[in-house]
Amino acid sequence: MEIQFLGTGAGQPSKSRNTQAIALKMLDERNEIWLFDCGEATQHQILNTTIKPRKITKIFITHLHGDHIFGLPGFLSSRSFQSSDEQTDLELYGPVGIKDFVLTALRISGSRLAYRINFHEIDSAGKIFEDDSFEVHTDLLDHTIFCLGYRVVEKNRIGELDANALKEAGLPFGPLFGKIKKGEIVQYEGKTFDPKDYIGADKAGKIVTILGDTRKSNVAVRLAYGADLLVHEATYEANESKMAKAHGHSTTKQAADVAKEAGVNRLLLTHISARYVGPLVGQLVREAQTVHSNTFVVKDFYEEKIG
């Protein structure tokens, strides 16, 4: 699992930072990419990456401020230009109003999509998705409008198969190995091969928390609890706490406080005000690291493997 930042700015695009969009790449786990927010020009940012729009199967919108949604109509339309045999439906999660925004933009512009969008409008906290390998939880953050944070939980994966031990026990390599890997007891030439004897302990799944705009809050701590990675906004430097509170945002140290209280492993800071460029970005990093050492301020196109 990898994360890539397509836009890391706050409020409006700048020469160095586009508006908010984050790609959670789950190609090895499920051959999919999940997109979190879709600010203006997200599709242009994607052109500078290896991301294929058809691989984006889910979009999670944190809130309806323009710097988080103005790229949606364009991206959704361009995604429709793929060949018909590559079309896949898309799941779109977000606050109440996201469906009206998207459908109105498509209708007024005369845009027709070659795939279906399944809308999931969220008005309360809870689990919004679950399958055999992942689940997603959401809760309400403390911003100036209704705003969500998302907690992506990978379920524990089955442990490694000890192929050498199976061979030494007399089982030839082949389809029977696959059955044991699936947890099936296998009989072969009078011998019983029990999966519990040949499969190691389950591997703990990863936890990734991606928050929308927010003041420091207990909800943010709960969503991030024990996460391998927390993505938190840091619109302002540490000494601008009053301004951050007034505008529904966080400072570097407040974001780091959340990470520390939640026991997070890695903290990545985004949603950076355009006032912070050059050496000032280093100042933001140092401020946060005084509270949570494993912290970094990301820039557009920054990519990192999780865990």
Swiss-Prot record:
Protein name: Ribonuclease Z
Active-site residues, record numbering mapped to chain: D67 (proton acceptor)
Top-tier EC class: hydrolase
Cofactor: Zn(2+)
GO molecular function terms listed in the Swiss-Prot or TrEMBL record: 3'-tRNA processing endoribonuclease activity; zinc ion binding
Cofactor: binding comment: Binds 2 Zn(2+) ions.
Keywords carried by this UniProt record: Endonuclease, Hydrolase, Metal-binding, Nuclease, tRNA processing, Zinc
Quaternary context: Homodimer.
Superkingdom of this protein's organism: Bacteria
Binding site for Zn(2+) 2: D67, H68, D213, H271
Annotated EC: 3.1.26.11
Recorded name of the encoding gene: rnz
Catalytic reactions on record: Endonucleolytic cleavage of RNA, removing extra 3' nucleotides from tRNA precursor, generating 3' termini of tRNAs. A 3'-hydroxy group is left at the tRNA terminus and a 5'-phosphoryl group is left at the trailer molecule
CDD domains registered for this protein in UniProt: RNaseZ_ZiPD-like_MBL-fold
HAMAP family: RNase_Z_BN (MF_01818)
Similarity section: Belongs to the RNase Z family.
Function: Zinc phosphodiesterase, which displays some tRNA 3'-processing endonuclease activity. Probably involved in tRNA maturation, by removing a 3'-trailer from precursor tRNA.
Residues that bind Zn(2+) 1: H63, H65, H143, D213
